[in-house]
Amino acid sequence: MALPGQQAVDYPSFKLVIVGDGGTGKTTFVKRHLTGEFEKKYEPTIGVEVHPLDFFTNCGKIRFYCWDTAGQEKFGGLRDGYYIHGQCAIIMFDVTARLTYKNVPTWHRDLCRVCENIPIVLCGNKVDVKNRQVKAKQVTFHRKKNLQYYEISAKSNYNFEKPFLYLARKLAGDPNLHFVESPALAPPEVQIDLAAQQQHEAELAAAASQPLPDDDDETFD
């Protein structure tokens, strides 16, 4: 039986909830996938837009029904109806705004209260912007909660597919699953400084080998 906002399809489909503070780029991220943007449906009872995002894997086609909050989070927490039946999730923060990272634990708690034991990806968005405030070494929450973390840039399409590939592998129980063709994405609006971002990725890898902070508060220099 299809869930609200989902038509029945004859290939695997999953409800993906995307959460995070307002302005972190969740809608921009989802809208990069042109087919999903064209076929989106608005669910007025819950106040969300549902974008069907198709990906083609070596095991066949899969679909993520991406639930986008349409900005509701700016007026307080999200209703449980947004989370119910969620099968996977992305928590997004903005690397240029520290508060959005500090609020990640709250989003994670709200998500896990309704959706138990689902695969979750933490995404640090806007890595194309020069004045980064959340440094790679300061991102430790994913290690504490055993989440996958990716640095992304929605406007440049940098790492767009990685969260979806990780979730697809987890949901399929197949670590060798891979995408056999790229989805149609909107053209990049900005260019990312790849050399600078590779340096951030190296710092992230180095930080992963360091002991975790003792307290729950993320430290900012």
UniProtKB/Swiss-Prot annotation:
Task: List compositional bias (Low complexity) regions by residue number.
Answer: 199-208
Domain Small GTPase Ran-type: residue ranges: 10-174
CC annotations in GO: cytoplasm; nucleus
A Gene Ontology molecular function term for this protein is: GTP binding
UniProt-annotated stretches for the region Switch-II: 71-87
Region (Disordered) residue spans? 199-221
Enumerate the residue ranges of region (Switch-I).
Answer: 40-48
What CDD domains does UniProt report for this protein, alphabetically? Answer: Ran
Q: Which UniProt keywords are present, listed alphabetically?
A: GTP-binding, Nucleotide-binding, Nucleus, Protein transport, Transport
GO BP term (any one): protein import into nucleus
**Positions contributing to GTP binding:** 21-28, 71, 125-128, 153-155
Keyword check for Secreted, yes or no. no
Spell out the subcellular localization from the entry.
Nucleus
According to its UniProt record, where is this protein mainly located? Answer: nucleus
Report the Pfam families cross-referenced here. Answer: Ras
> Its quaternary structure?
Found in a nuclear export complex with RanGTP, exportin and pre-miRNA.
Q: What does the record give as the function of this protein?
A: GTP-binding protein involved in nucleocytoplasmic transport. Required for the import of protein into the nucleus and also for RNA export. Involved in chromatin condensation and control of cell cycle.
Q: Which family does it belong to?
A: Belongs to the small GTPase superfamily. Ran family.
Q: What is this protein called?
A: GTP-binding nuclear protein Ran-A1
